Amino acid sequence: HQMNDGGEAKREGHITVGDDATLYYAPLPVLPFADSAFRSSFVIDLESTTSRLFYSDVLACGRAARGEEFAYRLYESRLRIKRAGELIYVDNLHFAPAEDGTDMAGLTQYEGYSHLGTYLFVNLGLEEEELREWVGEQLEGVGCLYGLTCFNEDAYCLKVLSLGSEPLVDLQNRIKDKLGRT
């Protein structure tokens, strides 16, 4: 939403996922308005290796239809995931396009794309090569750039750049279907 001069929005959360429980976390895409500032801090505690997680987060470049690509003041997001008390994942995004002069649309950032999707899979019994092949099939011909990383045992991070939120939300829904969740 629009903000008064200097205002900012915050989202903070801490979720504990018990033994033999599954958390599907998939909020609507974040769409920053021009001159907005958003800070998010989230901790997910997985009590054991039987605690399962699918996490999804989609960030738009701004309201592109209004010419507000990367016109926000600040987008800051910190995500920490612990499994059985051990920190296994940290994602710390800090985008301040106007402040630091970074070409957010350019090389090493959004690479000409407008949306960034992050998908995390933890303790879901997935095999890396099978997941990599499946993701490739889902995104074939969609015009996305993506990468999959195994960051711990049975723990994967998928990052996807696209030209719009639709391919990312569609992928999110296909992932939920694959995992047996609707």
Question: How should these model regions be labeled?
Answer:
Residues A21, S48-S51:
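Small-residue (G/S/T/A) turn/hinge positions that recur once per unit in extracellular repeat modules
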Residues L59-D177, R181-T182:
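A structural signal for small-residue-enriched, beta-sheet-centric alpha/beta enzyme cores
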Residues G7-A9, I15-V17, D35-S36, L46, ...:
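Solvent-exposed alpha-helices and their adjacent loops that cap or buttress functional pockets
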Residues G18, A26, D45-E47, S56, ...:
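Feature marks extracellular polysaccharide-active and adherence modules
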Residues S36, Y55-V58:
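Basic (Lys/Arg-enriched) interaction patch that binds polyanionic ligands
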Residues H1-S41:
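Intrinsically disordered, low-complexity linker/loop segments enriched in Gly/Pro
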Residues Y24, R52-F54, C157:
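General beta-strand recognition
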